[in-house]
Amino acid sequence: METSLSELLDASAHIGHSTSKWNPKFFPFIHMTKKGIHIIDLIKTIQQISVACMFLKKEVRNGKRVLFVGTKNQASKVVEREAKKCQEFYINQRWPGGLLTNWPTIKLSLKKLQLLEEKEKLDHLGSTSKKEEASMKREIQKLNKYLNGIKGMKKPPDIIILVDPSREKTTISECQKLNIPTIGILDTNCNPKSVNVPIPANDDSIKAIDLIVSKLSTSIFKAKLENNQFIENSTENLNEHVK
C-alpha cells in the first residue's frame, strides 16, 4: 500500500529538529528551512518507505526474520504492537548488550526464562516454598523486562528495524560487526549512513512512528501471508493489514 503525502503531513513527519542540531549528512533529505527548523523532504520519505517495504517483502519471502527496535517512549508501544501483528521479534526497553555479538549468552538467558516460567506453572502442585516462589517471580519479571519480545528467537535476526538510530548506538555497532542489514526511521539530527535503508521522518512524533512502522509491519505480514509462514491465528490481524 502506497504511502501518501497527506498521511505523512497529518502525522507531522516533515518536522525536523532546529537547524542548530542537524547532522550535515542528512542534507540530501532536507526540503527547506522554516523558522529555524529543518523541514524533511517527504517525497524522499515516501521513496525510502517503498524501498524498505520491497526489501522486507523480498527477504521475508525467503524466510528471513526481523527484529523491531524502539526503546524511546514514543516508539515503545508501537514497536511491540506491530512486531506482534506480523509475528516478529522486538526490543522496546533497554537493548540487552551482546544480543547479536554475544548470542550464546543471550540464548542461555532465554532458556533460563523459559525454565523459570515452566516451573512457575507447576507451583500449584506445591513444589516450591513461598520464599522461593517470590524469588522466582522477581527473576522472571527481571528477565521478561528485556527479553519478553525475543522469546522463541532461535538465532540472531536477519534484519533489524530501528526507530531513532541515534539512540541505538550499541545496536548499530553490533549490526555492523555481523553485517546485519538495518532499516532506520531517523530525524535531521541523525546520520543516515548509520543504517542501510534510511527513512527520513520526525522520529519524535508518535503518529509518524506509528504510520511508518505499521507500513513496514504490513509488508512483512503480506509476505508471510503469501508464503503461509504464520504459526497460528494468522488471519486474526488480516483486517488490520489489508485495509
From Swiss-Prot:
It is found in: Plastid, Chloroplast. Transmembrane segments: none annotated. SUPFAM superfamilies: Ribosomal protein S2. The keyword Flavoprotein does not apply. GO terms for biological process: translation. Pfam families: Ribosomal_S2. GO terms for cellular component: chloroplast; mitochondrial small ribosomal subunit. Keywords: Chloroplast, Plastid, Ribonucleoprotein, Ribosomal protein. PANTHER family: 30S RIBOSOMAL PROTEIN S2 PROKARYOTIC AND ORGANELLAR, SMALL RIBOSOMAL SUBUNIT PROTEIN US2M. This is Small ribosomal subunit protein uS2c. It comes from Cyanidium caldarium (Red alga).
